[in-house]
């Protein structure tokens, strides 16, 4: 198994996969991130820019599974394109000379532009890229290129919701610091997924004896919830005032997610991936996941 972009999710995946018997190789542009994965020996840690070809000769085939968990390299939309488009293209060039059986790419639910709170499935991505946010357009192009690239005999895209878990506490840290105003629209739905449930989903996909034709699947928990509901529940548990939301405070990163001046607001359905793999999130809603974090 090769894990590209081995950061927050990748480190957890590497730990579980290594214990499960996989020979794991890990890649990141951040040496400190790789050093934290003690179960992977130094000779199997590759520090490099993914979009560069400089790392290609460090990894030889055959490879049972290549998983790209890369996140944006920063620098706005240009960083998005560098990470998600050029990074995947670099992996494809590398795979042309190696026997790579399976490729998994983690995209995001930002490819869904709906703003009306409706429930969406994998079929609800608009045909016209101009209907997507700038970030969504880049991710959708990356998805399309991967699904069409036959250099990988089997390929799959997982669209992840907002990631949280140990050390990554959406809203929780803000409330603990005493912040009482949060950027955004409180009535908009959040589609979350716990880090450990992502790891379980990736391994569930790899356990399938045969993959279906190339396709995208949503990996989110079972119960999308309004932002204000999540924040209020956390505030109650912490014993602090319930914060209010202010859309005018949205930063540049949030503005790149807007569609037609509005923030995304939809409830993402995970039924297709559950039916395919039998995966069930251990944390089916935000309460389950955050209760564990609060108790920890």
How should each PLM-predicted stretch be described?
Residues 43-64:
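Conserved Rossmann-fold cofactor-binding substructure of NAD(P)-dependent oxidoreductases
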Residues 61-105:
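NAD(P)-cofactor binding segment of oxidoreductase domains
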Residues 90-132:
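Conserved Rossmann-fold NAD(P)-dependent oxidoreductase catalytic core, especially the SDR/UDP-sugar
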Residues 116-157:
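Catalytic helix-loop patch of NAD(P)-dependent Rossmann-fold dehydrogenases
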Residues 137-140, 151-152, 164-173, 183, ...:
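Glycine/proline-rich active-site loop of Rossmann-fold NAD(P)-dependent oxidoreductases
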Residues 260-296:
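C-terminal amphipathic/interface module of NAD(P)-dependent oxidoreductases
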């Amino acid at each position: 198994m090769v894990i590209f972009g081995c950061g927050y999710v990748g480190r957890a995946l590497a730990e579980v996969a290594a214990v499960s018997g996989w020979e794991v190789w890990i890649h990141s542009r951040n040496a400190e991130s790789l050093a934290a994965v003690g179960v992977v020996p130094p000779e199997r840690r590759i520090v490099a820019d993914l979009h560069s070809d400089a790392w290609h000769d460090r990894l030889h085939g055959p490879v049972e599974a290549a998983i790209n968990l890369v996140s944006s390299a920063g620098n706005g939309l240009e960083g998005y394109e560098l990470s998600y488009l050029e990074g995947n293209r670099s992996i494809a060039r590398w795979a042309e000379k190696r026997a790579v059986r399976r490729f998994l790419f983690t995209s995001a639910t930002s490819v869904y532009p709906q703003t009306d709170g409706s429930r969406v499935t994998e079929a609800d991505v608009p045909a016209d890229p101009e209907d997507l946010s700038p970030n969504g357009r880049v991710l959708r192009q990356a998805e399309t290129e991967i699904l069409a690239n036959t250099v990988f005999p089997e390929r799959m895209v997982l669209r992840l919701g907002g990631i949280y878990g140990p050390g990554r506490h959406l809203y929780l840290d803000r409330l603990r610091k005493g912040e009482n105003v949060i950027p955004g629209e409180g009535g908009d739905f959040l589609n979350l997924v716990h880090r450990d449930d992502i790891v379980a989903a990736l391994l569930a996909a790899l356990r399938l004896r045969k993959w279906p034709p190339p396709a995208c699947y949503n990996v989110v928990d079972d119960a999308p919830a309004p932002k204000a509901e999540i924040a209020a529940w956390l505030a109650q548990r912490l014993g602090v005032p319930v914060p209010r939301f202010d859309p005018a405070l949205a930063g540049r990163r949030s503005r790149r997610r807007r569609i037609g001046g509005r923030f995304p607001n939809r409830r993402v359905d995970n039924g297709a991936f559950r039916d395919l793999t039998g995966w069930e999130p251990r944390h089916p809603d935000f309460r389950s996941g955050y209760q564990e974090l609060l108790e920890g």
